[in-house]
Amino acid sequence: MSRPTRAQVAAGRVLIVGDAMLDRYWFGAVERISPEAPVPVVRVNREEERLGGAGNVALNVKSLGAQATLLTVVGDDEPARKLRGLLEREGVRAVLGSDPQLYTIVKLRVIGRSQQLIRVDFENQPDHEVLAGMLADYERLLGEHDAVLFSDYGKGGLTHIPRMIELARAAGKPVLVDPKGDDYTRYAGATVITPNRAELAQVVGQWLSLIHI
């Protein structure tokens, strides 16, 4: 199979569906230990916000030259507005559902002396299928795209993924899945599944060398 040309990649239209999040970074100087507990005191002097999760996947697709559309659900909160602004700035088309019961996922990393000191996660586990109300949007978007990429971070946004894969295959679209968890039967019908080494070991167990896979 030949590698696609740059022109072919640029002409591609990819629909990314999954768990989007906002990555926040606080950078600062560490000059002393807190008198309250044996932890460093970080004097923050710079903050950054970046696309995370499925948002970062969409950004990577865009950086390859393809057209990227992100379909996801976020909360009705300040991080959601930040996320929307970042997507707009990066040229990623965003179809964002808003769920007032959901916290937009934020991962805050505090960096001092060029190393990460702590990560704080802000999220809540939804008690309902957050993308269920967007299946009509998903079906409509299928006709406008050449492929579907599911970015599963296990945050509850892809409970309906078997149905979504079924709809994509019925529409003749290749399906790529970045998986999470140990139940890959959920991804039945996918064209390609791309676990990393740790994710694959979670499913098939540890191996000594590639010949054991």
Feature map (PLM): residue ranges:
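Conserved small/polar residues in nucleotide/adenosyl-binding loops
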Residues: 211-213
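Active-site core of PLP-dependent enzymes with the aminotransferase class I/II
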Residues: 155-166
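A generic structural signal for short hydrophobic patches within well-formed alpha-helices
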Residues: 200-201
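Short loop/helix-cap segments at secondary-structure boundaries that form the rim of catalytic
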Residues: 182-190
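A short helix->loop->beta-strand "cap" motif at the edges of active sites that frequently abuts
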Residues: 66, 170-173
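Structural motif
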Residues: 15-17, 119, 147-150, 176, ...
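Short acidic, glycine-rich surface-loop motifs adjacent to enzyme active sites
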Residues: 145-157
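Conserved N-terminal subdomain of the carbohydrate kinase-like
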Residues: 5, 13-14, 22-147
